[in-house]
């Protein structure tokens, strides 16, 4: 039971086709490969012994028959629990012949003669296999030649024949391409060739006259049934029909039937008429019918169709195999490429690892070398720096001892030589002098009110255009009579220079100042200074520079004879202040320094010059007054360039250096250089021009 249920689970029921004499017929699908089958379900509980014998005979007949025009039998299943028997047979998708006849009758049409001959030839071929136990010989190319004789049965089946005994349109099935399939061998009987069936079976419309006369059933009884089926296919009704069974038997024994329509050929009419003869000896047998010329021609056509179908199947199978081979080849190629890529990747990764290890090793070696070199270099630098610091420390100790011993001598020599502190020139320097390496940080400029930080350079768009020409013709000085300086105020560069403020305060005023600085107007447009032009210097107050007429009446700042200056008993406070060697030196001394170095807070009258010199001075004074000149005289400028010393002393030192009488002195024995302190002294500049705006109280 479990085995039967397991077998039943292998199939899927699709639909119910119909009912047979012993059970139900269903359309099923095999789950393993999707093959469509026809299952005949038979319940043998209520069967009699005779019916069970017929069922067993059908099993034996179906298992022994294998023909293209006979329904194929595959296997069976026996369900003992429910006493059911399943027969799995070939499925015919075209229906049966009775459905074709009904469709023709419903549409009021007649079957074509070609279709009738094709059905007749295949049906006769199937009966030939049942009656003679072998397949008929192939027609081949000899269509019009003599027909071969039937060979008959051989071996143990030589005296066995199969009678269908139930031929009717319902038992003739059609395939998808109108292939005839003879089936339903439930009433068939396996008998000896010399025996005759005496049992009355079959459908009354297709009974032969000998069956009606209670005579023996022979092979020619199936030929009578074939004639009745072909007549009904052409005429759309049976040849013998009556309301009662007795009338039907009388008509069959008489053998009279209505003629076929005239559009059918005489050959078809003669074949059907020969099959419907009352005397069975006058009827043709299966071998005679199969050798009819038209049937042979139809068989040849069927053979060609089968050959073409087989060739098409083989071609499809070949194409499928070729496709499978191509797919397998493509798969192999893909696997080959994959294996190759994997191999290349593995080799590349291996070599990359080796290369990386080698690179790391070489890099590590180089790093070790660099570390060793760095350590050696650091040690050398440290040793050099230690030696240098040691030498500097020794030098500073020696310099401090020397400076303390000669401090008094330095002060006396400074007072006797000149009124100004001596400045250091290149002849007074030595290799032992300390160097000033301290870098001074630039002072950060603070922002003023109503101003913005300058982040970009001025462009020409910041200057107002006065005229299209960038330069005036008047500035070219084409006239030889022009004596004044050329000035053009209409080109863009002069206009920009004129509109630019000459001086901007860098520091905002504070509350402790007396005067309020002039702040820029917030409404006046500002023009940023042009980085490509030299900035103009502002003027200081007028009272910071002495007038020429005042300077001309006073004696010169530097006396001609420094020995006449009175010696101060107490040292000056400003002189005692140590001058830092790192402070910026200035060769132009101020009036305060001159007065302090002279030893008197007042200026003394100098020696009167000769009349010739006085006359020259008056003339120079007049020229100065006419030209409105201010500042220091040329003599004072020359003395300033000489470092604050008198010109006579400078000339004397120069002559002594040329004569070789001077003895080189060390830096410790020389006078300290002159220093100008911007925080204490006032330094008027002689290079200022008049007519500019004066900035007051700017510190």
Swiss-Prot record:
Keywords: ATP-binding, Cell cycle, Cell division, Kinase, Mitosis, Nucleotide-binding, Nucleus, Phosphoprotein, Serine/threonine-protein kinase, Transferase. The gene is nimA. This is G2-specific protein kinase nimA. InterPro entries: Kinase-like_dom_sf (IPR011009), NEK_Ser/Thr_kinase (IPR050660), Prot_kinase_dom (IPR000719), Ser/Thr_kinase_AS (IPR008271). Residues 386-400, 667-683 have a biased composition (Basic and acidic residues). Belongs to the protein kinase superfamily. CAMK Ser/Thr protein kinase family. Residues 425-436 have a biased composition (Polar residues). PROSITE patterns: PROTEIN_KINASE_DOM, PROTEIN_KINASE_ST. It is found in: Nucleus. It comes from Emericella nidulans (strain FGSC A4 / ATCC 38163 / CBS 112.46 / NRRL 194 / M139).
């Amino acid at each position: 039971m479990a085995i039967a249920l397991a077998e039943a689970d292998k199939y899927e029921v699709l639909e119910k086709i119909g009912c047979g004499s012993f059970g139900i017929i269903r359309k099923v699908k095999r789950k393993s490969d999707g093959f469509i089958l026809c299952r005949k379900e038979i319940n043998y509980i209520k069967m009699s012994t005779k019916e069970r014998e017929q069922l067993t005979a059908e099993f034996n007949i179906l298992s022994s028959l294998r023909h293209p025009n006979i329904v194929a039998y595959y296997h069976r299943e026996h369900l003992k629990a429910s006493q059911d028997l399943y027969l799995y047979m070939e499925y015919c998708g075209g229906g049966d012949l009775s459905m074709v006849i009904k469709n023709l009758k419903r549409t009021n049409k007649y079957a074509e003669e070609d279709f009738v001959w094709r059905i007749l030839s295949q049906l006769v071929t199937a009966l030939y296999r049942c009656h003679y136990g072998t397949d008929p010989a192939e027609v081949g190319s000899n269509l019009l030649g003599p027909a071969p004789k039937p060979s008959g049965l051989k071996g143990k089946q030589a005296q066995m024949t199969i009678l269908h005994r139930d031929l009717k349109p319902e038992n003739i099935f059609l395939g998808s391409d109108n292939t005839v399939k003879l089936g339903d061998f439930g009433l068939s009987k396996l008998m000896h060739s010399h025996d005759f069936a005496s049992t009355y079976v079959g459908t009354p419309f297709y009974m032969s006259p000998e069956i009606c006369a209670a005579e023996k059933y022979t092979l020619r009884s199936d030929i009578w049934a074939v004639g009745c089926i072909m007549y009904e296919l052409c005429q759309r009704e049976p040849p013998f029909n009556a309301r009662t069974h007795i009338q039907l038997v009388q008509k069959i024994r008489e053998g009279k039937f209505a003629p076929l329509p005239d559009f059918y050929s005489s050959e078809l009419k003669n074949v059907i008429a020969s099959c419907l003869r009352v005397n069975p000896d006058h009827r043709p047998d299966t071998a005679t019918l199969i050798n009819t010329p038209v049937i042979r021609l139809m068989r040849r056509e069927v053979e060609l169709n089968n050959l073409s179908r087989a060739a098409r199947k083989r071609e499809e199978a070949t194409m499928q195999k070729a496709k499978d081979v191509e797919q397998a080849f493509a798969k192999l190629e893909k696997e080959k490429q994959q294996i190759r890529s994997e191999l290349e990747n593995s080799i590349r990764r291996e070599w990359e690892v080796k290369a990386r290890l080698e690179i790391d090793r070489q890099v590590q070696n180089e790093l070790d070398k660099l570390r060793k070199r760095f350590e050696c270099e650091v040690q050398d630098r440290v040793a050099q720096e230690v030696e240098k610091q040691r030498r500097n420390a020794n030098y500073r100790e020696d310099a401090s001892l020397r400076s303390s011993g000669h401090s008094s001598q330095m002060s006396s020599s400074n007072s006797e030589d000149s009124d100004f502190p001596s400045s250091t020139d290149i002849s007074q320097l030595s290799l032992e002098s300390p160097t000033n390496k301290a870098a001074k940080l630039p002072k950060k400029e603070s922002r003023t009110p109503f101003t913005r930080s300058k982040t970009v350079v001025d462009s020409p768009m910041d200057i107002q255009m006065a005229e299209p020409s960038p330069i005036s013709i008047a500035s070219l000085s084409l006239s030889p009579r022009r004596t004044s300086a050329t000035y053009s105020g209409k080109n863009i560069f002069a206009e920009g220079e004129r509109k630019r403020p000459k001086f901007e305060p860098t520091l905002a005023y504070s509350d402790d100042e007396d005067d309020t600085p002039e702040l820029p107007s917030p409404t006046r447009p500002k023009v940023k200074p042009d980085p490509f032009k030299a900035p103009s210097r502002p003027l200081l107050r007028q009272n910071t520079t002495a007038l020429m007429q005042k300077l001309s009446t006073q004696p010169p700042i530097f006396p001609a004879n420094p020995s006449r200056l009175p010696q101060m008993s107490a040292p000056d406070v400003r002189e005692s202040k140590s001058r830092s060697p790192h402070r910026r030196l200035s060769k132009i001394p101020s009036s305060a320094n001159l007065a302090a170095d002279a030893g008197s807070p007042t200026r003394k009258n100098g020696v009167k010059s000769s009349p010739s010199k006085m006359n020259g001075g008056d003339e120079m004074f007049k020229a100065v007054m006419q030209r409105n000149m201010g500042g220091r005289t040329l003599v004072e400028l020359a003395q300033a360039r000489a470092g604050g010393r008198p010109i006579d002393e400078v000339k004397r030192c120069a002559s002594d250096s040329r004569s070789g009488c001077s003895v080189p002195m060390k830096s410790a024995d020389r006078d300290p250089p002159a220093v100008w302190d911007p925080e204490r002294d006032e330094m008027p500049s002689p290079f200022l021009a008049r007519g500019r705006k004066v900035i007051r109280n700017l510190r």
